[in-house]
Amino acid sequence: MADTVLNTTVFDGAKKLITHYNVVSDNSGSTTKIVDVSALASNNGKTCKTVRLNKVSFNVSVTAPADAIRMQWDATTDVVFQTLAGEMEYDYSSFGGLKNTEATGYTGDVNITLPACSNGDSATVVCEWIKVYES
């Protein structure tokens, strides 16, 4: 059996992207691509190359909160940029959002992983992203 995952693009506009991710674990753990930049709408013919995390709201209910949800910039070696546990909201809009580190082999995509989980652990994560286009 596998984790039950719902990953939805709520809004894909010229400048903003809103995603909704929900998982109920069966104890197997999972990694899900929550942003696939190659599938995003373009803006005046320009292709989205990456995104910045502008705001995130989440409710994470896990047995091992020390190793809860990890958000990662996809690269040759993924870069963890946010760890989520409990119920909170973060707003990074005052400085333009959390920027992709563009590590070696970066794709612009964003992964979310539930590394240490027990049967019934769950999480809901809603993100507002700023789209960054090729020059």
What does each model-identified segment do?
Residues 1-59:
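N-terminal low-complexity, intrinsically disordered "leader/linker" segments enriched in small/polar
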Residues 3-15, 115-135:
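C-terminal interaction-tip segments
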Residues 33-37, 80-86, 126-128:
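Short amphipathic beta-strand/extended segments with alternating polar/hydrophobic composition
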Residues 53, 58, 69-71, 110-112, ...:
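Hydrophobic beta-strand residues in large extracellular and virion-surface proteins
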Residues 58-68, 117-120:
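Extended, low-complexity, turn-rich repeat/linker tracts enriched in Gly/Pro/Ser/Thr and Asp/Glu
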Residues 62-84:
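Short, surface-exposed beta-strand/strand-loop-strand elements in extracellular ectodomains
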Residues 78-99:
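An anionic, turn-rich surface loop/hairpin at beta-sheet edges
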Residues 96-122:
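Noncatalytic modules at the cell exterior or secretory-pathway interfaces
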